[in-house]
């Protein structure tokens, strides 16, 4: 089971009824089911903040020391590594988690204005762009990153595969 908590700090998000707990749960489940190590954990929790430029700018400054608004920020609750998920049956890090019935994945903050503007510029629906960013962020929460070309290719290929499940074309 996946429990999703959503805080909408910006009224424009309320216009997008399709961005809701059911969608977020469905996307999260689709990502997690790709990794056998998560199958033993019975309950996951994910916190979502739907906010605006001012708040995302503050968060980006505070946590990344970057004075610029961004589309999404991910804050993992656990120090996981994609290699542990992909290349081992049960890594020592994951072994600790598997003994528990519950795992808080982390927090994700989405910025309405940046996502809306990117959607317009890239000629895609804001919902499809949101789904892509959600997939990207969940992958960050479970240890994926794009610090080099190899990591970026692995992460992008996973995103493309998951997006195709939702009928969304590759953004790359």
UniProtKB/Swiss-Prot annotation:
Enzyme class: hydrolase
Coiled coil: none
EC id: 3.1.-.-
Record GO biological process: rRNA processing
Database matches in SUPFAM superfamilies: Metalloproteases ('zincins'), catalytic domain
A GO term, aspect molecular function: zinc ion binding
Primary localization: cytoplasm
Localization per Swiss-Prot or TrEMBL: Cytoplasm
Binding residue positions for Zn(2+): 136, 140, 146
Family matches, as InterPro entries: MetalPrtase_cat_dom_sf_prd, YbeY, YbeY_CS
Cofactors demanded by this protein: Zn(2+)
GO CC annotation: cytoplasm
Keywords: Cytoplasm, Endonuclease, Hydrolase, Metal-binding, Nuclease, Ribosome biogenesis, rRNA processing, Zinc
PROSITE patterns: UPF0054 (PS01306)
Keyword Metal-binding: yes
Cofactor note: Binds 1 zinc ion.
Pfam families for the chain: YbeY
Role: Single strand-specific metallo-endoribonuclease involved in late-stage 70S ribosome quality control and in maturation of the 3' terminus of the 16S rRNA.
Family assignment from sequence similarity: Belongs to the endoribonuclease YbeY family.
Name of this chain's protein: Endoribonuclease YbeY
Organism in which the protein naturally occurs: Rickettsia canadensis (strain McKiel)
Upper classification of the organism: Bacteria, Pseudomonadati, Pseudomonadota, Alphaproteobacteria, Rickettsiales
Gene of this entry: ybeY
